[in-house]
């Protein structure tokens, strides 16, 4: 897509005002129609999110990382449109539109006449009381809600497109990820327990050497799909409906998953938040409904790998020039490493028992 294009009859050229000016404009209640009483702003390493009344607007930062590129206006527009389309698979009523931020005679506006200087995803604002992480924290999650979540996931995974990459490529990428996880987690600046990191890493590599065929079989039977890619409790709303938001739109390869890999990740997060029962119920019900689940050993590998990845992502915040709450991330990484170690011990036991494979 060219950087310059006609959009709603208006010329979209350069990015115009800087990010700070855009954020300042989008932080004001009078920017929106109708104007909310206040606008709450949240920053991530990829986006700014503006909560304005019953709507949420997401502005992508002009950043480039190894796994994504939002550095140009055209790339951000493509990412916004991909986010809309992909997330409508699991939350069709939440994702409303892609909205242009325009400039005319030096003034910014959402939509209207002018030169497009950026793009935003407009979403329905969900009731945070019903997000899965809040339900767990408040002791309000029920087995019936978990059952409804499983039903939604079953429908999604049955409709999801099978992955188009070869299992050998997938396993090679897994090994590269293990290398990266180990390298970051052994960085002496983070003071993480190196012996534990090595033990976890060894168990995962031994599994891939001895039992990688279990992953190949999931590809052979077309069980690996274009999934969500970031199935966390804070992305799941369980009010009158089940809405799952914030899939990984920016990198299709990161959405190539075994459904039970995603559920292993979600069960891990539920356990970390104090609801291990919910994660186990998710696994059991999904196994029953899809009728094609992996072995216990493969599910344990998925949990071990995801916990290690989350540990690495936690301390990776400290590579940023000005990380927020720097004291938090090593503690979070240790929590994930403890979960990974538990799964690694189970993997070691499985690997000693050929019949468990």
Q: PLM features: what roles do these ranges have?
A:
Residues 1, 99, 347-351:
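Extended hydrophobic/Leu-rich segments
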Residues 1-4, 200:
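A composition/secondary-structure signal for short, hydrophobic, low-basic-content segments
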Residues 12-19, 171-174, 201, 326, ...:
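Intrinsic-disorder-associated interaction segments
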Residues 20-221, 226-228, 233-309:
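Conserved ATP-binding subdomain of kinase catalytic cores across diverse folds
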């Amino acid at each position: 897509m060219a950087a310059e294009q006609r959009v709603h009859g208006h010329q979209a050229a350069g990015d115009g005002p800087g990010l700070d000016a855009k954020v300042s404009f989008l932080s004001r209640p009078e920017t929106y129609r109708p104007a909310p009483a206040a606008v709450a702003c949240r920053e991530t390493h990829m986006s700014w999110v503006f909560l304005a009344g019953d709507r949420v607007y997401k502005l992508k930062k002009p950043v480039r990382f190894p796994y994504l590129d939002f550095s140009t206006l055209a790339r951000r527009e493509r990412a916004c449109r991909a986010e809309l389309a992909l997330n409508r698979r699991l939350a069709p009523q939440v994702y409303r539109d892609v909205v242009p931020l325009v400039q005319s005679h030096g003034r910014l506006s959402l939509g209207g006449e002018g030169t497009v200087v950026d793009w935003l995803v407009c979403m329905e604002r969900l009731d945070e009381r019903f997000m899965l992480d809040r339900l767990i924290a408040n002791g309000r999650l029920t087995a019936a809600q978990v059952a409804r979540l499983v039903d939604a996931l079953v429908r999604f995974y049955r409709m999801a497109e099978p992955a188009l990459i070869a299992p050998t490529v997938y396993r090679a990428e897994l090994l590269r990820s293990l290398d990266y996880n180990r390298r970051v987690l052994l960085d002496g600046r983070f003071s993480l327990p190196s012996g534990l990191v090595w033990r976890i890493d060894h168990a995962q590599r031994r599994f891939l050497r001895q039992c990688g065929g279990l992953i190949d079989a999931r590809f052979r039977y077309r069980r690996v799909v274009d999934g969500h890619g970031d199935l966390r409790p804070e992305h799941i709303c369980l009010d009158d409906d089940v809405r799952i938001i914030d899939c990984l739109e920016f990198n299709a390869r990161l959405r190539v998953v075994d459904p039970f890999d995603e559920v292993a990740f979600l069960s891990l997060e539920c356990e970390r938040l104090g609801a291990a029962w919910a994660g186990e119920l998710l696994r059991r019900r999904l196994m029953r409904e899809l009728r094609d689940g992996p072995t216990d050993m493969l599910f344990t590998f998925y949990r071990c790998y995801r916990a290690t990845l989350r540990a690495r992502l936690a301390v990776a915040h400290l590579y940023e020039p000005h990380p927020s709450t720097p004291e938090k991330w090593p503690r979070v990484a240790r929590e994930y490493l403890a979960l990974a170690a538990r799964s690694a011990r189970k993997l070691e036991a499985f690997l000693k028992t050929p019949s468990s494979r």
